[in-house]
Structure formats: structure tokens, C-alpha cells
């Protein structure tokens, strides 16, 4: 027979779910008392998703709930967080899920987290470039990063909010102002460019995409996305026509999805998949796994620009090493110059947003 305290806890837990006060959110003292699983959750890392109710955030939350490295999953948004939290929390995996609604709960969502994933912001619409998103998303990223600087300055930050070429510099400037900036812990997520490159190259070569690795460097918009097809693994040769086709399709993959959805959304599902793939790499790095290498938009000395996307090795402190570009062919060298010219303006735009 179960001891009486256990029975009471179980009854309280059921009652909290059947009769939630307003919403099943972290602010509820009844739910906090009932959520005894959280005290002894599965070993792992604490992860927060900021923008968890959005088009990327929802599938991202679902996939992170499935990750065995996650012990606690915090879902934050300014709208609809209670519903997403309730839905995701029913999945029979180890991570304990907690929801947080609105600016007043941002600090609670962030406190004690190991990894912060930020897909918050408005999505792309037909005819809209990533730079068109700047005016709205820049302010959102600024506010969220101010919270991160205050509540979990040692967390690894995976920034998805577009335009990444500008929002990463914004985040860096916010952290600098707060005195918490660690360039090893701020990473712009460009994994979707790599995922697309692997997929499209595999189609041309007739291979399984899981067996293909294409380094994608530069940035995360248009011509700043530079796939290094000369460094594809397994080693492969391409005709000039194939190189032009692949480069163009990789650079414009986001537009391809926006147009195909005809106003109904952007690349939310593939982005969520790519974000989870990158987050998993960060968590494996935090765990101490060796040889965790992915591409990301980070503080860099690879070029004369202060930020650049290239391969990085991930570890317990975030970025352990930033790799050089390696040998480039003539087509890639020309593409690199175009990418740097475009990137310089985007980076300055982000820096100026905070400094001005």
C-alpha cells in the first residue's frame, strides 16, 4: 500500500490538471506543488524555447521533448503558450515541460537554463526578404537577450530569429552592454542551409542525404549563403551547370518554400528539424562528447568581418574552435567576396540598432 503522502501528491497532481487555475502555467502555485516529477526528472540539460507557440516553435518544442538529453523544457511565448505546453506535456518522454506566458514570466522561463533556443519573431511572407523582418524582429531579439543577460548569462544561446546576419550582432551588443558577453556561447543557427545543401547535393549525386556533408559558410540570407561544393563529403565533382544550379537553389531554398506555401507560411518544419539537429549538437558538446562539429554564424576571425558562418567545434563551453574555410576554388572565391560585401552591411545594421 502506498504511503499517504504519495497518495496525496498523486491526487493533487490529478486535481491540478483537471481544474487548472486560468492556465497550466508555471505561475500556478497549485501546479508547482503538484509537479513533483520536476524535482526528480531525468538527468540531462535544461532547455528553454523562446517563441514556442509559433510556426517554428511548436514543432521545435515537440522534437526537443523527444530528445533524451533534455530533462527540463521551458516553453515561453507572448501568446498561446498554455495550449502548446499542455499538448507537448502529454508526450510520454522524460523531459518535464513547463509553460510561461508573457513578458512578466520571461525571467522565470530563463532562470537556470543551460541552452536557450530563440525562434521568436514574425515569419517571412511572399515577397518579403529577411531584411524586411528586421524592424520587428530586432526589437523582439533585444528584449529577449536582455532577459537572458539577466537570468542565465552562462547559457548557450541558439539564435534562429531572422535576419540572423543582423540579430546575432544585436544579441552580442546587448550582452556587451550587460557585461555578460561570451562569444563562445552565442551561435546563429544556419543549420537549415546545411540541411538543404546535403539534400540537394544528394539528389544530384544519387546518394542518401545522411551520407552527404556540405560545408555552408558566410551568412544566412541570399548570396551570403555560400556552399563549398569543392569540399563535399564524399569527395565529388560537379559540372559548372550543376554548381550554378545547386548554389542558387541552396541560397534561395527559403524563398522556394515561401512561394510554394502561397502565403500560408515559411519554412517552419524544415527549420524546426534543423534547429533541433543543431541544438542536439550543442547538448552533446555540453555533455563532453568529442568531435562535435557543425556550421554556425558566430564571432569569428576567419575573415575581416566580426561575424561569419563556418564550421565550429562544440564543447562544454560552447564554441571550442572556429575552423578556417580551407582551400576554395575560383567560383567560391568570387562568391565569398559577394557574401562578405552583403554581410558587412547586415552586421553593421544590427550593431547600429543597439548603439544608436
UniProtKB/Swiss-Prot annotation:
Gene Ontology CC terms, in alphabetical order: chloroplast; glyoxysome
InterPro entries listed in its UniProt record: L-lactate/malate_DH, Lactate/malate_DH_C, Lactate/malate_DH_N, Lactate_DH/Glyco_Ohase_4_C, Malate_DH_AS, Malate_DH_type1, NAD(P)-bd_dom_sf
Binding-site residues, substrate: 124, 130, 162, 196
Subcellular location per the Swiss-Prot or TrEMBL entry: Glyoxysome
Active site: 220
Disulfide bonds: none
Pfam family for this entry, one: Ldh_1_C
Keywords on record: Glyoxylate bypass, Glyoxysome, NAD, Oxidoreductase, Peroxisome, Transit peptide, Tricarboxylic acid cycle
Catalyzed reactions per annotation: (S)-malate + NAD(+) = oxaloacetate + NADH + H(+)
Major location (coarse): other
Transit peptide interval: 1-36
GO MF term list: L-malate dehydrogenase (NAD+) activity
Residues annotated as binding NAD(+): 51-57, 77, 137, 160-162, 271
The enzyme's E.C. designation: 1.1.1.37
Family of this protein: Belongs to the LDH/MDH superfamily. MDH type 1 family.
Subunit structure: Homodimer.
Entry protein name: Malate dehydrogenase, glyoxysomal
Amino acid at each position: 500500500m502506498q504511503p499517504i503522502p504519495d497518495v496525496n501528491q498523486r491526487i493533487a497532481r490529478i486535481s491540478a490538471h483537471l481544474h487548472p487555475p486560468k492556465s497550466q502555467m508555471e505561475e500556478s502555485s497549485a501546479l508547482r506543488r503538484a509537479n513533483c516529477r520536476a524535482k526528480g526528472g531525468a538527468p540531462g540539460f535544461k532547455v528553454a524555447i523562446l517563441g514556442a507557440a509559433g510556426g517554428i516553435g511548436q514543432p521545435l518544442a515537440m522534437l526537443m521533448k523527444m530528445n533524451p538529453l533534455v530533462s527540463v523544457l521551458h516553453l515561453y511565448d507572448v501568446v498561446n503558450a498554455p495550449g502548446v505546453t499542455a499538448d507537448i506535456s502529454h508526450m510520454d518522454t522524460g523531459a518535464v515541460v513547463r509553460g510561461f506566458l508573457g513578458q512578466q514570466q520571461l525571467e522565470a522561463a530563463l532562470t537556470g537554463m543551460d541552452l536557450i533556443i530563440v525562434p521568436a519573431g514574425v515569419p517571412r511572407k511572399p515577397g518579403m526578404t529577411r531584411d524586411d523582418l528586421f524592424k520587428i524582429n530586432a526589437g523582439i531579439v533585444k528584449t529577449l537577450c536582455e532577459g537572458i543577460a539577466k537570468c542565465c548569462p552562462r547559457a548557450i544561446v541558439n539564435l534562429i530569429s531572422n535576419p540572423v546576419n543582423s540579430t546575432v550582432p544585436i544579441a552580442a551588443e546587448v550582452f556587451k552592454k550587460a557585461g555578460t558577453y561570451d562569444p563562445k556561447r552565442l551561435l546563429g543557427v544556419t543549420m537549415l542551409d546545411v540541411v538543404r545543401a546535403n539534400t540537394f547535393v544528394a539528389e544530384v549525386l544519387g546518394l542518401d542525404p545522411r551520407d552527404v556533408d556540405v560545408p555552408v559558410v558566410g551568412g544566412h540570407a541570399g548570396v551570403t549563403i555560400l556552399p563549398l561544393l569543392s569540399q563535399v563529403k564524399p569527395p565529388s565533382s560537379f559540372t559548372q551547370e550543376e554548381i550554378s544550379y545547386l548554389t542558387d537553389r541552396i541560397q534561395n531554398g527559403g524563398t522556394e518554400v515561401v512561394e510554394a506555401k502561397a502565403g500560408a507560411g515559411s519554412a517552419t518544419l524544415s527549420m524546426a528539424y534543423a534547429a533541433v539537429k543543431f541544438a542536439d549538437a550543442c547538448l552533446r558538446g555540453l555533455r563532453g562528447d568529442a568531435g562535435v562539429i557543425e556550421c554556425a554564424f558566430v564571432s569569428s576571425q576567419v575573415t575581416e568581418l566580426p561575424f561569419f558562418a563556418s564550421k565550429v567545434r562544440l564543447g562544454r563551453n560552447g564554441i571550442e574552435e572556429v575552423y578556417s574555410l580551407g582551400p576554395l576554388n575560383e567560383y567560391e572565391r568570387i562568391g565569398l567576396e559577394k557574401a562578405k560585401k552583403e554581410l558587412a552591411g547586415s552586421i553593421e545594421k544590427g550593431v547600429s540598432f543597439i548603439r544608436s
